[in-house]
């Protein structure tokens, strides 16, 4: 499945569980992240490694030369971002980035990063997450779909009560899940439990995941509607 398919599927999977524009960006970031193990390694991944590695290195220097300037939060942030890019850098295509382990790990980091940046602006935080997994060409294309999803949200005007870091993590989870589901529908399948198992999820398992997602979506919207009555 190409970027367009993953973008559309990411929006579909994310919409039932989000209620704001920044969450659209986060869902799209999750939907596009797994394919950082592919052709964009030379572009997006290496750029991310240089930036995050620079943040970590500068903080280490500050720690040894002037501890008063050392920023623990910035250091941790740099390490987390570095980990996000190291996974696809050392992964084969449809390797570690296409697993449930990576889904949980990366979603937590991207969501937490957005949560920490939300003091500036929640929309800015979501957009930064999307920028981390795209280049200027892909970002321009994806934003067209993001604006459409934004319009749909404006019409539906949902009120899903999720707060704190979870508010930023969940959209990434559902976006990421959409990517794995999309790839189960292809002949190559997905080794979602790699490296513990090489068993491939294919269409049958993909349909099961879609059914689970649909049940969760129905439950969330049923709860939301009942809370309004």
Swiss-Prot record:
GO terms for cellular component: plasma membrane. It comes from the Archaea. Its main location: membrane. Keywords: Cell membrane, Membrane, Transmembrane, Transmembrane helix. It is a multi-pass membrane protein. The chain crosses the membrane at residues 8-28, 49-69, 70-90, 113-133, 136-156, 162-182, 208-228. It is found in: Cell membrane. This is Uncharacterized protein MJ0790. It comes from Methanocaldococcus jannaschii (strain ATCC 43067 / DSM 2661 / JAL-1 / JCM 10045 / NBRC 100440).
């Amino acid at each position: 499945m190409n970027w367009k398919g993953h973008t559309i599927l990411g929006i579909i999977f994310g919409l039932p569980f989000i209620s704001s524009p920044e969450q659209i960006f986060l869902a799209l970031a999750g939907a596009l992240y797994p394919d950082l193990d592919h052709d964009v390694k030379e572009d997006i991944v290496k750029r991310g490694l240089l930036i995050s590695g620079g943040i970590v290195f500068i903080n280490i220097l500050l720690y040894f030369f002037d501890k008063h300037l050392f920023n623990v939060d910035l250091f941790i942030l740099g390490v987390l971002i570095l980990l996000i890019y190291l996974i696809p850098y050392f992964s084969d295509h449809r390797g570690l980035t296409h697993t449930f382990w990576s889904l949980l790990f990366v979603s937590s980091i991207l969501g937490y990063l957005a949560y920490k940046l939300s003091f500036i602006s929640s929309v800015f935080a979501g957009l930064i997450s999307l920028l981390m997994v795209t280049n200027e060409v892909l970002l321009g294309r994806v934003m067209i779909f993001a604006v459409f999803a934004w319009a749909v949200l404006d019409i539906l005007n949902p009120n899903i009560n999720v707060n704190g870091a979870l508010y930023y993590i969940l959209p990434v989870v559902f976006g990421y899940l959409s990517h794995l589901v999309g790839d189960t529908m292809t002949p190559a399948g997905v080794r979602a439990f790699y490296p513990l198992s090489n068993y491939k999820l294919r269409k049958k398992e993909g349909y099961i995941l879609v059914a689970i997602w649909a049940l969760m979506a129905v439950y969330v919207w049923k709860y939301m509607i009942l809370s309004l009555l």
